[in-house]
């Protein structure tokens, strides 16, 4: 990583504005999944060890620039306090006199959590005045919110222009793992691209075709490829305007010597529900009024073999409608193949893939689960992430 990190700077007695990603699910004022809070702990603990006065900032949900009571960060402060085992102060603003006073009262190693930064309309507009106001609270800026690194907002990008700006440990790890995967991968290198829409994955497929040895396609987007090959797909998901593009990807793979895998069979259903009638059929046998909602057993076996023979696998997007148990088998098979592949470094690209490995209880058997859905996707597209670009170079 060519950016400075929190390890590279002297922080004793300094006020540090640390942007974290505490955008966690809540129910009735209680955090229901604290994964993202836990992910930030190493950075917070290192800041405390280095004697910093820690000012944490995060967004939560989409309050659209106004105060939404149920999107206040108080439940997050409560959970963070439990995890850290020490007090976490909380203010109801993210800048201004009240925030300044709380920041000035901090002692070395103390922790303060500011209010939801998206309560301010200037946050998502990257308003320079708001960025300056955030910066005025601190001596150093640490960005540990990889999940928001693809956004140029006041607390993720604007602030970095006003104070020393460095990466947190989580940000550093994400950039190192994803960076190495894309620039200097161990081979064979396999990418598994799933999800519903071709249009969401065009950039990723384009960028990865230049880098991978194997490209595996699954999920709803696969049926546009299958239709483009001349097969009937019944009522399966189709983006007719992307069929030419799908063909061109397959051609490009051939030219580059990349093995391009699409499903050879599918689980089809007569209805989009858990209690639909289902059957496994070869890909050219999908009945006219049924839809394919998962990859079939032959495809699972093929994909498993490719995964097992790979040194590096990046996975972004499920193989089927894994939220419904009847169509979760393909996604589970891929997750299990990754869990069983001892010599394979597995990178799970956030979002639905991360949710899937959690659901199947296999998360701790993956080498790296990215904390950023959109951010890891844009990184894999080869795009520069504004929140990273703004940090100080080494």
Swiss-Prot record:
The modification Phosphothreonine is found at residue 299. ATP binds at residues 201, 323, 350-353. The modification Phosphoserine is found at residue 183. Substrate binds at residues 21-23, 36, 59-62, 118, 151. It is an enzyme of class 2 (transferase). Its main location: cytoplasm. The keyword Kinase applies. One of its GO terms (molecular function) is ATP binding. Belongs to the phosphoglycerate kinase family. HAMAP family: Phosphoglyc_kinase (MF_00145). This is Phosphoglycerate kinase. The gene is pgk.
